A protein has these predicted regions:
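N-terminal topogenic module of multi-pass integral membrane proteins
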Residues: 1-68
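Hydrophobic cores of alpha-helical transmembrane segments in multi-pass inner/ER membrane proteins
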Residues: 23-36, 78-93, 141-155, 189-204
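Short hydrophobic alpha-helical membrane-embedded segments
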Residues: 24-29, 51, 55, 138-144, ...
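Membrane-interfacial loop-to-transmembrane alpha-helix junctions, especially the N-terminal start
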Residues: 41-51, 102-109, 156-167
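Aromatic-anchored segments of alpha-helical transmembrane domains
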Residues: 52-60, 112-123, 168-179
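Loop-to-transmembrane alpha-helix initiation sites
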Residues: 71-77, 180-194
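Membrane-proximal helix-loop-helix units in multi-pass membrane proteins
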Residues: 72-149
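Membrane-helix boundary connector in multi-pass membrane proteins
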Residues: 154-165, 172-186
Length: 209
């Protein structure tokens, strides 16, 4: 059992968005900018934008807001902040190259990122969540983790997979929470998280000369 229900969580989200208005609109713009930067090969910019969002969600949502309802929120928040710090460090080193190369992995990554940016808030709304509480990547943890997994698939390989571990772990925790709260689309997150991580680790097919 959790110390809150779905109604309390979405009420907290609405309060959070109102406190930092116009956060939802800024998150939408952030998502478009990050997706464009990653697909175009501006790896450092995209990684820094992901880092900023992860730190923001960890500090502003989990630690400053959600901790009032969930005793585990500060732990989750710390993990998001750590993920953001690692992303920023990797961006500074320039070791991970993001680019849309029309590989199967890239199409999946692009689809996952778009699903997080457009599909997640849309399904929230169609599920009866009022607009002030609708979750978007860059502002709320579930779509932020899903969006990050999609963006990082544009790199693939073990270096990108290492960056995907914490977001993938979050999808498992969020899926369990979604099951308890009866939020259907949250329950699918572990499948997406594990599949994205496995795809990142899958070797690229060799091109025959």
């Amino acid at each position: 059992m959790l110390p809150f229900d779905a109604g309390a969580m979405f009420a907290a989200l609405a309060h959070y968005h109102a406190t930092f208005w116009p956060l939802q609109w800024l998150a939408l713009a952030w998502g478009v900018a990050t997706l464009g930067a990653a697909a175009s090969g501006f790896s450092r910019t995209a990684l820094l934008l992901l880092a900023a969002a992860s730190i923001w969600v960890g500090a502003a949502w989990h630690i400053a807001t959600f901790a009032q309802l969930n005793f585990a929120a500060p732990i989750y928040g710390a993990l998001f902040v750590v993920e953001g710090a690692v992303l920023a460090w990797v961006a500074a080193r320039g070791r991970v190259a993001l680019r849309f190369r029309r590989r199967a992995r890239d199409w999946v990554g692009l689809s996952v990122a778009v699903a997080a940016l457009v599909g997640y808030p849309l399904v929230d709304r169609l599920s009866g969540v009022p607009w002030p509480a609708v979750r978007l990547p860059g502002a709320a943890p579930c779509p932020t983790a899903l969006f990050a997994l999609g963006i990082l698939l544009l790199a693939g390989g073990r270096s990108a997979a290492g960056l995907m571990v914490l977001p993938a772990l979050w999808t498992v925790a969020a899926g369990a929470t979604g099951w308890v709260l009866a939020i259907g689309h949250d329950q699918l997150l572990p499948v997406a998280g594990v599949a994205a991580l496995a795809l990142a680790l899958r070797p690229e097919p060799r091109v025959r000369s």
